[in-house]
């Protein structure tokens, strides 16, 4: 605990919160081109092959985006839109790729939470 004189000499510094999605530059979404599409394994208690893509954004950032939903059509040079939102069990994945936007197709046969996966309303 500092003394009063110590606090007068150098007051307490306000801690700045760091940006969790710096590549978006305060935009809701950003467009980019896939440079690599691959699968990776999650952290310790979980086990799966998670689909991710390395994306070069229009502002020059290179980020890793998660591809949500079952099945996808992405490959190298696909143009995608990313949004913020990390994947807790994949270190370094701080962005999500939007389904049903630009080159990314929506999830097939999706009945619930369709808007999250770019799926059209079933007839």
Curated annotation (Swiss-Prot):
Keyword check for tRNA-binding: yes
PROSITE patterns: RIBOSOMAL_S12 (PS00055)
Assembly and oligomerization: Part of the 30S ribosomal subunit. Contacts proteins S8 and S17. May interact with IF1 in the 30S initiation complex.
GO molecular function: rRNA binding; structural constituent of ribosome; tRNA binding
Keyword terms, alphabetized: Methylation, Ribonucleoprotein, Ribosomal protein, RNA-binding, rRNA-binding, tRNA-binding
Name used for this protein in its record: Small ribosomal subunit protein uS12
Biological process annotations from GO: translation
One Pfam family per UniProt: Ribosom_S12_S23
Keyword Ribonucleoprotein set for record: yes
Modified residues (3-methylthioaspartic acid): 89
HAMAP family: Ribosomal_uS12_B
InterPro entries in the cross-refs: NA-bd_OB-fold (IPR012340), Ribosomal_uS12 (IPR006032), Ribosomal_uS12_bac (IPR005679)
Family as reported in the entry's similarity comment: Belongs to the universal ribosomal protein uS12 family.
Annotated CDD domains: Ribosomal_S12
Reported function: With S4 and S5 plays an important role in translational accuracy.
